[in-house]
């Protein structure tokens, strides 16, 4: 299965590592508020960074193995489908963490 990606801040990722799972959907909304965690394909990450993360420092891109998530992953949206994780993201499902900038 192809990896999916999520952009977050270093601080939020560090908190998730300490907790064992990640529960933030977007910069401003939690998993509980949104109902899922917003993700992107590799090709969608640059556009996501441009649209939502301009001027934000200390960003990281989480590379996620969907087979390790343990929650439903659905591709949704029109005209372009984005991957959504319908549950918390286990830290163990993140196979790489890379610094990125918008």
For every predicted segment, state its role.
Residues 1-102:
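Conserved, structured core segments of small domains
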